[in-house]
Amino acid sequence: MATAPATEKKAPAKKAAAPKAAAPKKAAAPKAAAPVGAATGRIAQVIGAVVDVQFTGELPAILNALETDNNGNRLVLEVAQHLGENTVRTIAMDATDGLTRGQPVRDTGAQISVPVGPQTLGRILNVIGEPIDERGPVNSDMTAPIHAKAPEFVDQSTEASILVTGIKVIDLIAPYAKGGKIGLFGGAGVGKTVLIQELINNIAKGHGGVSVFAGVGERTREGNDLYHEFLDAGVIAKDADGNPTPDGSKVALVFGQMNEPPGARARVALSGLTMAEYFRDQEGQDVLFFVDNIFRFTQAGSEVSALLGRIPSAVGYQPTLSTDMGALQERITSTTKGSITSVQAIYVPADDLTDPAPATSFAHLDATTTLSRAISELGIYPAVDPLDSTSRVLTPAIVGQEHYETARRVQETLQKYKSLQDIIAILGMDELSEEDKLVVARARKIQRFLSQPFHVAEVFTGIPGKFVPIEETVKSFKAVVDGEYDHLPEAAFYMVGGIDEAVAKAAKLAEEA
């Protein structure tokens, strides 16, 4: 498998690359050009996204990219299987409508490669690295194959430090690790995309390094909104004429949306990751890699799996589910050169966390943020379940003793309240002991205090977004579990930032009463 980090593209002489791109170019290895008179074949059959191609001479290798013309558009096919009788089975990266049997297909002699480097910043690309933002070609003279080996163990870094998000429930209960992998689990409509957009707002905008956003099988509208938000926030820079420019931009976007064929959705996460790896390995940067939604990567794999003739495994998923997931996730890691911190939204089919797709992702993650429908029904947003979310870095050695104890006491209070809910439902609050009544009152305040207004939701809610520093979060929750704010009404804790805002809101409520 090709593992070259980046390769020079044989192309007509162009303008010299910007001086700042010169340093990493030394590491780029020359790419073997597609052989002269490279193998050509003919389409034998087309079944949806899967195309069989028959060759007369040498067969292309597995994962090679083949090219054909489809009504004037370049269509890329990736070799998935050798069937015998000089036939290969391929997965199409775009719609196959209009293909005909007997149509010629050319072997490129290499894997699908995408542009990498500073010129990809501020651009929107598709799975095969073509720009889809109507702003002309990407002026990068470096490309990299989308399939690569994961870094060796000796090259990986194991330092643990916290990535502050400014979101109370996350920073307190399930903090994120720098250079770690984070999963946002949730069913349909509980707020995964809004949470990932808030994380982009809070982390990427203040982050000095580069971010890569891979939109995998999600709504085109959300991708469009995100692009315009980045433009407004200055994450994508503009030139003197007000047009987006790579110079000064901090984010590259790669989209393979819901309307794309499964081939594109199954590979677009790898295309985005390849761009992120370049910044990590060649420029030594700390990269943020956002994926929305990793479940669609699995779903696309299962769509083509049956067409490839594989026997389905549990719940109809592809038999190679954990291998496919591992091949992607093992590449998302921190090395001695730089780091990739990955935030992945993971759709949970029918709210069932034991479904093979989300369950396979769990094993790879450093922190899991589980979004609960029951909490969203209470109107508490972000609808993070504090008892079901976990983090590898929530240990006294990393977060400190005070933070660790506060988080555990908050969880303990909420767990006691959860166990008392059946009694309350049957007998009512009056049957509880005084001690239990106090636990319930505190737990309900904590529950509401874990809500927070988001910057990205400000246009819908009309409430200004809040970023809460981690020290203030710990101090506020410690005071609440210690009973310092038992005298404040529950409503004062809902949709505020720090504890000072809750006190001010309580005073305002008292005036209105």
From Swiss-Prot:
Pfam families: ATP-synt_ab (PF00006), ATP-synt_ab_N (PF02874), ATP-synt_VA_C (PF22919). It is a peripheral membrane protein. Its main location: membrane. GO terms for cellular component: plasma membrane; proton-transporting ATP synthase complex. Produces ATP from ADP in the presence of a proton gradient across the membrane. The catalytic sites are hosted primarily by the beta subunits. F-type ATPases have 2 components, CF(1) - the catalytic core - and CF(0) - the membrane proton channel. CF(1) has five subunits: alpha(3), beta(3), gamma(1), delta(1), epsilon(1). CF(0) has three main subunits: a(1), b(2) and c(9-12). The alpha and beta chains form an alternating ring which encloses part of the gamma chain. CF(1) is attached to CF(0) by a central stalk formed by the gamma and epsilon chains, while a peripheral stalk is formed by the delta and b chains. The keyword Zinc does not apply. The keyword Thylakoid does not apply. Signal peptide: none annotated. Keywords: ATP synthesis, ATP-binding, Cell inner membrane, Cell membrane, CF(1), Hydrogen ion transport, Ion transport, Membrane, Nucleotide-binding, Translocase, Transport. Its EC number is 7.1.2.2. Residues 1-29 are annotated as: Disordered. One of its GO terms (molecular function) is ATP binding. InterPro entries: AAA+_ATPase, ATP-synt_VA_C, ATP_synth_F1_bsu, ATPase_a/bsu_AS, ATPase_alpha/beta_chains, ATPase_F1/V1/A1_a/bsu_N, ATPase_F1/V1/A1_a/bsu_N_sf, ATPase_F1/V1/A1_a/bsu_nucl-bd. The lineage of its organism: Bacteria, Pseudomonadati, Pseudomonadota, Alphaproteobacteria, Sphingomonadales. This is ATP synthase subunit beta. Belongs to the ATPase alpha/beta chains family.
